[in-house]
């Protein structure tokens, strides 16, 4: 097959790209080429900015070598305008178009619901989820062989799955290793379904040019589920540390960490369980579930610990967590150590760790300036 992957260097698309290559396909990936660590050297890289380059320029780059593709997989569309532009550029020059949506688009009726593809969609509690739903609605009106894929929380060697975690995910591991408290939502009791990217890739691959997948939507998830607290406990065991949490309820989360409020009340702070019968029927067997949670998390931890370029610390997040831990559970902590810590990192930490003090200092300085 000639396969075009829009993306190809993210956590979800990297293992899928590898799977397609390992199966002997010709794989093109379109991305900006910035994350060279995660771009497989076997791919035919189309270096382009899908959001900002003119459509005619992008079309010329995409179809420079071949006039059409068997399958195009879109990991990059997050809002309907993205999808509309992408399909305009592609101009129907493919057999199957696969849109990577999200299982967060489901609009759950209750915490005990086992989600199927017939469950209601349109989760209005989180903008990301609702926009994925809007993308799906747009795609369903298109006269193409589309397939909608709804992954849930996926993880792999370069992603640590956790509900409250910054973009620089090593920060979480660093806090655990430093015996600092980790912020959890409602004791970490919410049930999560975590899917390793290798297992996701195997199932998705079997939907390529599968006529049972045309004009259909599927979620692809693991068959096991566990509370988030168990995920944290395993991480602590892998790092040879004892668990130490600071739990926030819903009101405290909205007050102290509003940037995480939507994703928690609309997704990761709720129970998420799935029935994979539909996709299993389409591929003729059960979904792949070959990587255990412990083995998958060990793979992630080892990758972060063995690659210095992954060991970035978000000192704003570190300071924010220490402020909350001191405020809520009276646990006092110091800034994380790092051989590459900069002066501005220390400043960021202290601004977040001592917000009231910094506010008063700034107010005092402003008053002095006004008096001059």
Tell where the protein language model's regions lie, with residue ranges:
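Mid/C-terminal beta-alpha module of Rossmann-like enzyme folds, strongest
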Residues: 206-264, 276, 299, 310, ...
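Substrate-positioning beta->alpha
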Residues: 164-172, 185-208, 215-216
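Conserved Rossmann-fold cofactor-binding substructure of NAD(P)-dependent oxidoreductases
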Residues: 47-68, 81-82
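Short-chain dehydrogenase/reductase
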Residues: 113-136, 153, 162-170, 193-194, ...
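Conserved beta-loop-beta element that borders a ligand/cofactor-binding pocket
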Residues: 136-161
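N-terminal Rossmann-fold cofactor-binding loop
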Residues: 30-34
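N-terminal Rossmann NAD(P)H-binding glycine-rich loop of SDR-like oxidoreductase domains
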Residues: 3-23
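NAD(P)-cofactor binding segment of oxidoreductase domains
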Residues: 67-114, 119, 123, 130-141
């Amino acid at each position: 097959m000639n396969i075009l992957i829009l993306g190809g260097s993210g956590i979800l698309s990297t293992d899928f790209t590898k799977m397609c290559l390992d199966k002997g396909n010709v794989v093109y990936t379109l991305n900006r080429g910035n994350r060279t660590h995660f771009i497989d050297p076997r791919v035919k890289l189309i270096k382009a900015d899908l959001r900002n380059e003119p459509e005619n320029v992008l079309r010329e780059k995409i179809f420079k070598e071949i006039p059409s593709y068997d399958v195009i997989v879109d990991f990059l569309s997050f809002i309907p305008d993205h999808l509309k532009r992408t399909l305009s550029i592609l101009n129907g020059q493919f057999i199957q178009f696969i849109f990577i949506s999200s299982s967060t688009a489901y609009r759950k009726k209750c915490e005990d619901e086992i989600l199927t593809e017939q469950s209601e969609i349109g989760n209005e509690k989180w903008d990301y989820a609702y926009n994925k739903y809007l993308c799906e609605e747009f795609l369903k009106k298109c006269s193409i062989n589309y397939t909608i894929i709804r992954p849930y929380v996926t993880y792999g060697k370069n992603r640590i799955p956790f509900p409250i975690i910054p973009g620089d995910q090593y920060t979480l591991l660093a806090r655990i290793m430093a015996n600092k408290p980790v912020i959890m939502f409602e004791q970490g009791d919410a049930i999560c379904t975590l899917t390793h990217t290798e297992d996701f890739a195997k199932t998705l691959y079997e939907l390529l040019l599968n006529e049972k997948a045309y004009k259909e939507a599927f979620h692809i998830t693991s068959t096991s589920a566990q509370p988030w607290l168990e995920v944290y406990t395993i991480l602590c065991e892998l790092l040879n540390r004892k668990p130490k949490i600071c739990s926030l309820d819903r009101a405290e989360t909205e007050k102290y960490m509003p940037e995480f409020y939507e994703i928690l009340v609309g997704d990761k702070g709720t129970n998420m369980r799935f029935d994979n019968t539909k996709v299993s029927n389409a591929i003729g067997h059960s979904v792949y579930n070959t990587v255990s949670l412990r083995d998958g998390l060990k793979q992630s931890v080892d990758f972060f610990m063995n690659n210095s370029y992954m060991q970035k610390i978000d000192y704003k997040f570190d300071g924010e967590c220490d402020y909350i831990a001191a405020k809520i559970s009276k646990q006092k902590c110091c800034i994380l150590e790092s051989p590459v810590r900069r002066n501005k990192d220390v400043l960021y930490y202290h601004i977040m760790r001592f917000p009231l003090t910094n506010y008063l200092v700034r107010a005092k300085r402003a008053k002095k300036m006004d008096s001059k």
